[in-house]
Regions:
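Terminal, basic amphipathic appendages of nucleotide-handling enzymes
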Residues: 2-71
Length: 71
């Protein structure tokens, strides 16, 4: 599934949304670990494939989901 994520800065969502692929079950508001080790928060799930068609070959996949007790 395609999701939208905002990077975390000082623990708060910051900046614009970026699109990632996720093979993990995620929900809006959940913290995820991004490629390269940064963290972000999910702002949208189930982004339609037609919305990302023009750049889907460049979309990276999230590395994992931060479990609630890890936050």
């Amino acid at each position: 599934m395609y999701i939208k994520v905002k990077f975390l800065k000082n623990g708060e969502p910051h900046g614009r949304e970026y699109t990632y692929k996720s093979t993990f079950p995620v929900r809006v508001g959940q913290e995820v670990i991004l490629p390269g080790g940064g963290n972000g928060v999910v702002t949208e799930i189930n982004v339609p494939e037609e919305d990302v068609e023009s750049f889907k070959d460049k979309i990276k996949e999230i590395e994992s989901v931060v479990e609630e007790d890890e936050q």
